[in-house]
Amino acid sequence: MKNPRLILITNPGSSSRKYALYREDELLCSLHFEFEGKKVVCTLKNADGSKKKLKETFPDLNSTVGALNKILTEEGFLGGVSKIDAILARIVATGEYFTNDHLVDKECLKMLEIAKKRTPLHVPVVANEIEAFVKEFKGTPVIAISDSAFHADRPDLMKYYAIDKDLADKFEIKRYGAHGLSVGSIVNYMAREKILPEKLIVCHLGSGSSLTAVYKGKSLDTTMGYTPLEGLCMSTRSGSIDAAAALAVKRAMKFTDDEDLEQYLNKKCGLLGLSGQTDDMREIIRLRDEGDDRGTFAHAMFVYRVQSELGRLAASLGGVDAIVFTATIGERSAEIRRCVAQKLGFLGFELDNKKNESDLENRHENIAAEGSKPIYVIRTDEFEEMIRRAKVILDGDKCDCGCGCEKGECDCDCNCDCNCNK
C-alpha cells in the first residue's frame, strides 16, 4: 500500500509566513513565522492545539522556506521514508491563466512574473515564496492553486465590465473574483451533507469580504472583480468606488503614481479609514457601543454594503433558498449576523436570536427561526479545498472532482457533476 502523502501548504503574508503540514487530509502541525523585534521567530502548533515557540531565530522572512525541512525533521514530522510529497500555494492573480490550478513549471514561473507587474499588491509575496520552494525542494511538486477557479465558468454577463470587449479580452481586464477556495469548500461540504440548495448566497466575511451567488453548486455571480478591491467595505479595503472618485483621491493625497493610490485603497480605507482607529470588527462594535460616531458609521457602512449586495445577488439568482455566513467575522460575530439579517425578511429569512448567540459546536449550524428559510453558519476550510484540488493534479487517473475514485468508475456519494463515469 502506498504511504499517505505529506502535503505542505504555504500562506505567506506581508509581515508573516504561515505553513501547515498535512498527511493527506489530516492536519499534523502548523508553523507561524513573525517578527519579534528585529528577528523572526517561529511558533509550532500541533494538531491537538498545543504550541511550542522554537529557540532558533531567523534573520528575515525570506529565510523561512530554507528552514522548514530542518525544523520539521527535528520535530519528528519528517525523516526516514517521510518526506514532503507536494507543496501548495494559493494564487490570487488576474488573467485567464490563473483561473486554473497549475503544477509550477517554467511556464508558470514566467506567468507569475507577468502577474507581479499586473497586480503588485497581491502577487509578489506568494510568487517569491513559490520560487523559493522550487529552488529549495527540487523534485517536489509545487502546485499553484487558483483562488478564482471556482468563478471561472460564470456567464460572460457576470465577468465583463461595460468597457470595449476587444480591449477587455486583449488585456484580460475582467471580473475574476476571489475567495473561490472558501466558497468551494462551503459548497462541497454542503453537497456532502446533502444540504446544498439550488440557489445559495455565501457571505464570506473576514478581513477581506465578498458575497457569492451559487446556482446548482456553481458560481453565478460574486462581488469581487478584477482584484479583491471591488465589492464590499472590508477591513482596510474601500470596496467598490467610482473610478473618478479614486482619481480625485489620488490628486487630493498628491500621490505620484498609481501604485500609491492602489496601496491606499487597499490598506488605508474600509473600516480603518471610516473609523480612523481600527480595522478589527470587534473593536468597531465596541466603539459603536461606546457611542463613538465614526465607529458607529463604520459598522453601519459594513452592514449596509453586505445587505445591499445580498439583495443584488438575490435578484441575480432570481430568488434565494439559503444563506451561509462564513470566515472570521461571518463565523464568530453574532452581532454582525443579527444586523445583516434584520432586513432580509422580504427574502424569507429570519434569525433565531438564541441560536445565533450560541457557540458553533459543529462545523455547521442552522440559526434560522422556525418557518424561515435556512441561515447557516459554516466553518470554511480553504486548506481542505486546496488539498482536494491538488489531488486532481497529483492523481491524473482519478475522478476530476477529487473524490478518489478511478476515472470512469466513480460510484461514491460525492455528489459531484464532473461526469467522469458517464
Where in the sequence are the language-model features?
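Conserved phosphate-binding catalytic cores of ATP/NTP-utilizing and phosphoryl-transfer enzymes
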Residues: M1-N3, H122-F137, H179-L200
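Histidine-centered metal-binding segments
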Residues: D397-K422
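Catalytic phosphate/nucleotide-handling subdomain of diverse soluble enzymes
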Residues: Y215, L220-M253, D257, Q263, ...
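Short glycine-rich, Thr/Ser-proximal phosphate-binding strand/loop in the N-terminal lobe
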Residues: S14-P59
